[in-house]
Amino acid sequence: MQRASESFDAIVVGSGISGGWAAKELTERGLRVLLLERGKHVEHAKDYANARKGPWEYPHRAGRSRDMIDAYPVLRRDYPLNEKNLDWWVNEKESPYTEVKRFDWYRGYHLGGRSLTWGRQSYRLSDLDFEANAKEGIAIDWPVRYADIAPWYDHVERHAGISGSIEGLPQLPDGQFDPPMPLNCAEATVAGRIAKKFSGRRMIPGRVANLTQPRPGRGRCQYRNACALGCPFGGYFSTQASTLPAAMATGRLTLKTFAIVTDIVFDRDRKRASGVRVLDAVTNATTEYSAKIVFLCASTLNSAWILMRSARDVWPGGLGSSSGELGHNLMDHHFRCGASGILPEHNDKTVYGRRPNGFYIPRFRNLFGDKRDYLRGFGYQGSASRQGWQRAVAELGVGGDFKDAMSMPGPWQIGSTGFGEMLPNHANRVTIDESRTDKWGLPVLSIDCETGENERLMRRDMMNDMAEMLEASGAREVRVNDNGSFPGMGIHEMGTARMGRDPKTSVLNAHNQVWDCLNLFVTDGSFMTSSACHNPSLGYMAFTARASAFAVEELKRGNL
């Protein structure tokens, strides 16, 4: 092993949503930062190889080949794996993991991580979420409240570019929004009828990290709905389009790709992290890099893996394990449960472009005096559109009349799936499986996680409530569905290094510092103390920016 000759003020591990924000905030506040990414370099626009291709330009018309299906046993289960997005997903044979219970882990090891492929829905937590654990006696209390985080939501929204509408809903705080992507005519009709017939229920435009107004160096969304291929216009928030250019512009960022962080180097005398050990993914050489502070942003499960492999001579369970909570309380959102129907009106209208967004129905259960036989609640995400020629694939029509009929759009269809909160549970955990190794000889992660009775009870309402709203709005042929949801499918994995008020019951404090090592900050989904019911990535941005500002001030004071 060799030691790098240059030391840094800060090391950031991971270049996804959290890592990109840490790099931006720390460099802009004057620190010299080393950003480490375990995967390949991806240059903005230039390396989005499929962003402008049509399906006819692929060997299998942007579908799946048998080789792809065989090579990706996890991705093939549910995610729409195809020729278009194959570049963004981990080779599962090179990077396996152990499933004690089924867990679908969708990983992207490359510069930018899943900031290139995320769904971009961006919602704030409220005190309803921050206070729920304490009020209900579940797990532990969050060490922060909305007032602590609200200024940082403002900060990241202004830079990232979140489009949305001002609604004044207590369960879903408003933000610093660009103009929303409007509901289409069918959605607006249903939204009006829901508001009229159901107290406390609202259908609003999704709040999404797609620009409706241009930013410096970024164009507004082109309504292509090809976001998961990388946007050469910078129309949605990603590391490449937003935070990385800002960090690079400071002249204080050093970027290294193909750099697998295997563990945090811990100085047991100072009780501080002195740096990280890095395995070169190409040469297998190991190098130790040093810094005054470390930000661990490798994504929830990889950050847990790194922590559990660090300082084991001091704590057998790894760095941050003194509470016994490291690796525990893994959560995800459960979904794929809702309803759909046909609207018999607006057949003289159709959609404009390919809007990369839909509607959102914020949580309404267990609020405003409503009391169910389960805790917490769910929100809905969905959209309405005209049916296309695919509606006739299963029919046996032939001839000119049939062809003419299929050349016209079909009726409006509307559908939605609920996203439900998953309660924290100590039994849902990850460990290191020393009996299996990956391509680089490193032991793999073992995941033992399942939903519980609370989630199962919630799914009944997720299905029936949507059907009720559609029927009341005039939809016909309303059908309910529950296609099952295993942890990991939501791609919102969080927990394993929760923040709290007491080092005896949590891994991190209120500023995302590891209690056992105060110059080590963890700001990806690991820190989540509960899951709420909506997409968490905006929260990761806000907490990362807040922790970065705090870290710089603590460095100046000599406390780190």
Regions found by a protein language model. Give the residues of each.
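A glycine-rich dinucleotide-binding beta-alpha-beta segment and adjacent secondary-structure elements
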Residues: 204-211, 219-225, 262-269, 409-422, ...
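Glycine-rich loop(s) and the adjacent beta-strand/alpha-helix scaffold that form part
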Residues: 28, 32, 39-59, 250, ...
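Conserved redox-cofactor binding core of oxidoreductases
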Residues: 59-66, 70-104, 109-110, 118-124, ...
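N-terminal glycine-rich phosphate/pyrophosphate-binding loop and immediately adjacent elements
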Residues: 2-133, 138, 143, 147, ...
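FAD cofactor-binding and catalytic pocket of flavoenzymes
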Residues: 85-114, 118-119, 124, 142-143, ...
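Glycine- and acidic
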Residues: 134-138, 173-177, 225-231, 290, ...
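A conserved FAD-binding loop/helix module that cradles the flavin
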Residues: 530-548
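Short, glycine/acidic-rich hinge or "gate" loops at secondary-structure transitions
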Residues: 44-47, 163-175, 476-484, 557-560
